[in-house]
Amino acid sequence: MKKNIIAILTYITLIPLSFSQNTLSKYLVDKETKAPLKSATIHNANDYTVTNDDGHFVFYSSNDSVTIKMLGYETLKTTFKALSRTKDTLYLIPKPFQLDEVTLSNKNIIQEAYNHASTNYPMEPFVEDFFLRCILKRNGELVKIEDFSGRIKRDKLLGAEKNFTFQLLNMRKFGIEKKGVRADDFNIPSLNDVFQWWSNILFLNQENYHFSRPKTIDEQHQKIEYTPKSEDDYQKSIGYFIINTDDYAIKERIYKTNPKTIHKIPYTKKPFIKYRTIDYYCKDKLEKDAKKGKYFIANAIVNVKVEGYVGEERIVYDVSFELIVTHPFSDLSTFKANVNGKKELFKLDVPYNKEFWETQNQLPLTNEMRDFINKPHNPKEYRVISNF
């Protein structure tokens, strides 16, 4: 069987350590339920980070101020100095609003968000510092892990035409590939592909979707759900927008596969193999930079499940991307492109910096990842690919 490549377009934080910076490591939970708060934003005028699945974050900055916020909760404004005297766990207070209690007017808030796009989002060249994690699983088992720290330069945030250039600063990768011509494989997309997707589908064609009446989240945010007008259209997603009613900026978006149409998704057929995407989930969170007055995608998550058959054997691939932007408008003059953005992610070659990865504390390897890396892999069956 010929080698077949399944290609699809399909975030944990970190800020590089530097001298004379303040350091903060805490857990963030709901004050009432004590549940960990995932993807809450911690920032000041210079730096950004977010909490992980356990509500944990590590924040570095030379600026003493700290703002901690999450939709539906009271914002906490404090300092590194003040937080250094607190316990390891911080509590956010839920705002006294119920999501489904208040339904507002018929004003087309979606159209207002579209009308304000050119003022809310950067429309001129800018550079962002980012971290990106990619994980690939085959039938529930890890096969590839890749972490990046780097910078991206683009002409504008939305509607870009793959006019990206990249400066990768650090990379850590480990993976296995089956040997032999009967091997099936999964081709992870390029940096261009990943950022192209995040740049181009923040907005939807209103002609193709039904939008719900807006519902109040808090005094500044409304939620609008959407569904495709054609219930049988498997190519259209379901999801929601959360929009700031002060400036009509999109603050959060969910875009996912409609479970009612999965059975309609056809297979792509090639010699000896057929495959299809059976689940897709994307979540974008945007923040406003205080200095520039523009919004940027601070945190994005993409999870994709691909089902394939090699003969009678069913294979399920799960690929996930996690992105966080730590410096949304960094120094344009210091940007130096050093990699080909069109090259498949796992084929990029950047030397491993042991000191960086062992001290950054922001993209830690999970126990599952460590077990995968340390596990003996049969050299007759697998080819190990690693830069460390």
PLM feature spans:
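A short, amphipathic beta-strand motif
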Residues: 24-31, 55, 90
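Short, acidic Ser/Thr/Gly-rich low-complexity loop/linker segments typical of extracellular
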Residues: 47-56
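Short Pro-Gly-centered beta-turn/loop motif in secreted/extracellular proteins
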Residues: 34-37, 58-65
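Surface-exposed, low-complexity/disordered segments
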Residues: 88-220, 270-388
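A short, solvent-exposed loop/turn motif at the edges and junctions
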Residues: 44, 68-78
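Short, ordered, surface-exposed loop/turn motifs in non-cytosolic proteins
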Residues: 24, 31-45
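Extended beta-strand-rich segments in extracellular/periplasmic secretory proteins, especially
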Residues: 198-257, 290
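Bacterial Sec-dependent N-terminal signal peptides
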Residues: 1-27, 388
